[in-house]
Amino acid sequence: MERRPTASFEPMNDPDPRWVETTRAVQRDLDRSAAYQLAVREAELEDIMKGRLEAPPPTQYGWGKGMLGVQDGGGAIMDAQLVDATVEDVTQHIREATKCRHPAQTDTQGGDKEGDFKARVTRELRAAVEFSTGHEDMKGEFARRSAVQQRIAASLADLSSELRAKYSPQHVRCAYFEPINVAYVAAMTNALRLPDTDLAMRLLLGAKVAGDLPATKAWDARFKPGSLGMRFEDLPHGQWNEWLHGDIERRATRSGQARETAEIIRARTASEIDAGLSDGYWEKEDLDERYGVNGWRALRRFAVPQADKIRVCDDAKESLVNAGSNTRDKLRLVEADFPARMAKLYAEAIGESSGGLDLIHGTEDIAAAYRKVPSDSMAFTTIAMYNTRALPRPGEEPNGQGFCPRVQYVQMPGMPFGLTSSVTTFCSAATFAAHCARRLLAATTEGFVDDFSIVGMAAWDDAPQRAMVKLMRAIGLPFSGEKHERMAPINVFCGVISDFTRLRKEGIVMVYVSQKRKNKLRIDLERARSGLTPKAARRLVGKLGFTLCWSFGRVGRAALQPLQARADSDADESFVDWALLRSINFLSAIVARLPRRTIKVEHDAEGRMPICVWSDARYEADAEDPAEGGFIIYVPGEDGEEDEWIACTHVTPTEVVGAWEYRKQYIGQLEILYAVAPYFTVPEVFAGREVLHFIDNTSACAALIKGYSRAIDSGLIVNAFHAFNVGIQADVWFEYVRSKANIADFPSRDAWEELWQAFESVGVDNRKVRWVECELPPIFSLQAPAHAWIGAAEARLERASRTTGRTTGSRSDSARQRPELKRRPRRVCRAGRQRHVLRSALGARRALSRVRRIRWVATRADPKGGGCGKRRATGTALRLSPGGEGRVEHRTGASHQGPHAQHPSQRTHGTVHS
């Protein structure tokens, strides 16, 4: 086997000359060590990849970039589409689209353009799965491999101590926490040919804290300059320290609550000092004397309340340490659905002969992780805090408890929580540990900062987890026993539950957030009713975004618009207006009934091809019918049956456009409206199926993928679609198609000759195309709660199943004859079929008044006060029973709240009683 040069370290770009000199000296010591050379050779023999760096199998870009089973908006629209975005011929597009497999069937790990690091991790995980599933006694093999690594690490312990005593700065040598085995890190980096060749030196000499940070090379390269606009070294550190000292003292003594917070910070800091993670207490004068007035810069320590504890953080943003730091790494962290991804890899490796996949997974955590990787100088890891129990200095009069409270300082040999450099420094060490576990233990594991997930077969019990625990202890980054979660079918990783209980029999992994997290989120939403500041809104949006993304589809994301607007506001306001309260009510209902995300591990055993949908819309204000739309559906045949084609053309009811905010152009809203129309029209066709949906409008495509749109009108439609889709469980992949290649462009603009020719060009008998009556989402019920849409979808599917006697998701038995050539298909508007000319804002209002026959109805004042005016119009509405089950009905009298409507808090939310 070809050997790599023995050098384990490479100088940084424009490095410190002392760093280069020390690196060469350390390398000479390693080369002279027989134990080091033997460790490298043993590790090369244990490597399951044997140094191979072959390219991974191709994957579909855009699928699973953020989460498994979730389409990525950026990559899906233009990057490496299933059907090339440059196709301009309808026939060519249909032929290519109907041959495509759904990305969920072709992708396992989640393809995305993340460069060499992602490819390396994918290869390692795949190799670990293939090795472990092909071994006869993997439980014993984990124990053997773990013992080998422990022996190698023990053989290098003395060498690590010698290197540390000879080269490490004093604060690293004197640190009380367990040191990392740098000789072992250097040997494994060499043996496995890992790109982060400077890791051992950073752990030996300490990592740079601020300024121009060198690239770690643990991930792909990306230069990100600091926002400071000047060199960090040129900042007036002395002036900052003077101001911060006085400001901390003023804040700590201004109220009783501030003094209580200061006591909490002191207690947490004291526990770190007792654990040997910090050194203190120091006076400002001591540090000025040690480093010089401008030679150090302090960070303010503050308290952050969490679920069951108070965490202390150090404000590197306020002190401009982060703003003054340039980074050169594109940090990549695993997603919380890692266990589900591994389930797909195991299913792929085992295949149909397995007779069922039985997996378990566990989690581990490194306590005080950042504190255990050394910094190069404590001058910039100095923490300022108000010590409520500071001992009196000579000449000072103590208080009644014998203390003289004042500002004091604590120094850390490791990295503080809050620094940009802390994240890259520690994560590079954690990434190294994950590489070793995958290649030397054959464990399928990955880490999110200091949290690690380990997945394995149930037959192995917790053998891979025990091997991982021993490996981390050998490296010098031991896991915390208090946060150990033994491998089991159900476990939590990064706040998300991965449930394997249905994996063996059904091939399904369920991913969802815990009920405890949802309950806390509902409490936060309830508190927001009384007032919501921009800072609180930012925290709430972050929590909601995380929670909603782990439910099925993108349900609820559009309802975040008012909260996001408050979060982005620069004004100091907390008043909860009607839009905010409506959003809070909607999100509270969603969180209470949040559907779980289900991920198919073995896709479509029957080999069913996906359904294809093309949709389009048109808006011309001066036309006889200003707004029109249509869609074409292709349902591939099964069991020898013929393929089915479904078509629809539709004149948009005037009240639909009139219900939206006035603008000169409505094409964006209409494209979204007619993109979701197929699923409301024939939901039984899409139930439980994989779908490829082509749209010739990039903004509509992006909105449907992300589940969010800045335009309120569009956002309501998108939100209704994703909620409705929870009920029908369609796995929809949206993709862009050029207008010239979109067959749905023909029915939306009355181009019947072109439509018949397009059908005939792909061998479709026009007479067998089934024309359906378009059913739009009820425009006057778009603000209904999510569970109402879910109930409406389930009711529609149940009704369709009773009517046809067939399971949903299957083909229909009936097919309508096509209209005669050149004859326009019957286009029905359930809310009334009138034609109107919308030429101006005034004309639109007058036309709308004539169609709707608007009349104001005086209503009795609400018992709680405040009258309410209503206007009634012909339209559609979502009818809800008191129990929350909904059904879509078309009726006269869909109500809108008039300009004198009372505040939402004075009305009942969530249901419209039948």
Put a short name on every predicted segment.
Residues 446, 680-742, 749, 913-914:
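RNase H catalytic domain
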Residues 404-432, 634-673, 699, 708, ...:
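A short, polar/acidic, helix/strand-boundary loop motif
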Residues 2-357, 373, 473-478:
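Intrinsically disordered, low-complexity regulatory segments at domain boundaries
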Residues 363-367, 416-418, 440-458, 489-497, ...:
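Catalytic palm active-site di-aspartate
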Residues 339-344, 363, 444-446, 454-523, ...:
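Polymerase palm active-site segment centered on the conserved acidic dipeptide of motif C
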Residues 488-602, 745, 824, 833-847:
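C-terminal reverse transcriptase regions that engage the nucleic-acid substrate
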Residues 257-260, 264, 269, 273-427, ...:
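Catalytic-core region of right-hand nucleic acid polymerases
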Residues 423-468, 678-695, 914:
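Active-site palm subdomain of RNA-directed nucleic acid polymerases
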